[in-house]
UniProtKB/Swiss-Prot annotation:
Known partners and oligomeric status: Tetramer of two alpha and two beta chains.
Pfam families xref list: Trp_syntA
Family of the protein in this entry: Belongs to the TrpA family.
EC number of the protein: 4.2.1.20
Reactions mediated catalytically: (1S,2R)-1-C-(indol-3-yl)glycerol 3-phosphate + L-serine = D-glyceraldehyde 3-phosphate + L-tryptophan + H2O
Pathway named in the protein's UniProt entry: Amino-acid biosynthesis; L-tryptophan biosynthesis; L-tryptophan from chorismate: step 5/5
Enzyme class (EC, first level): lyase
Keyword terms of this UniProt record: Amino-acid biosynthesis, Aromatic amino acid biosynthesis, Lyase, Tryptophan biosynthesis
One term of GO molecular function: tryptophan synthase activity
CDD domains found in the cross-reference section: Tryptophan_synthase_alpha
Organism of this sequence: Bacteroides fragilis (strain ATCC 25285 / DSM 2151 / CCUG 4856 / JCM 11019 / LMG 10263 / NCTC 9343 / Onslow / VPI 2553 / EN-2)
Record-given protein name: Tryptophan synthase alpha chain
Active-site residue numbers: E46, D57
Gene this chain is encoded by: trpA
Cysteines joined through disulfide linkages: none
Amino acid sequence: MNRINQLFDSNPRDLLSIYFCAGYPTLEGTTEVIRTLEKHGVNMIEIGIPFSDPMADGMVIQNAATQALRNGMSLRLLFEQLHDIRRDVKIPLILMGYLNPIMQFGFDNFCRQCAECGIDGVIIPDLPFKDYQEHFRTIAERYDVKVIMLITPETSEERVREIDEHTDGFIYMVSSAATTGAQQDFDGQKRAYFKKIEKMNLRNPRMVGFGISNEATFRAACENASGAIIGSRFVTLLHEEKNPEKAITRLKAILNLSSNDLR
């Protein structure tokens, strides 16, 4: 069974997934970040593939991607770095990146490399669901790579149900239609969106991302889904500390989490 399915199989709550950009802050630090996050009890990790035009991301992640590219990170190098990661890392790993570099690499080759490295899923924010269905789904399923689709408050109920029916892993609930970045709390409109999706009784578990930056937003996400995805706040801490151990320790303090709260 795919590790994403294994994670959600027992209907867990309060899951923490962390996003970081491969090759940032240092080119060779990718596997160190992964191992450090797992050691601290993080349940799932999203590894960002740096791209020059990350349209769904705010300035924090854009700047990290720019620096990672300057450092020399590429998709080919990332797969080389991840080749032996499954010798000791057990939690689900997901690659998150834009369609352009993945298509240049070749989608079949990309999925094959994911399978060989033990990557469990992929998030491609600019992949239309129709294109996924017609051109990508068969290839991804051949390699047991879960393609995680995003929904926003603007996504129609019909499309949400289509995504729920034709994907298998989890649904990424974007907290707003804006780019990634910190929010102090979720307003009534966002909370109504969470409740609307909850009432749809979807078969797939849900994770909330975009804007999770403190204990209030983390708890609100966990109340309305299986857990939260944190990106910009962790990348900011990684920028400040230049050390994944210190960065995740600070993040857990901000979220008021101990290692016992995770897993």
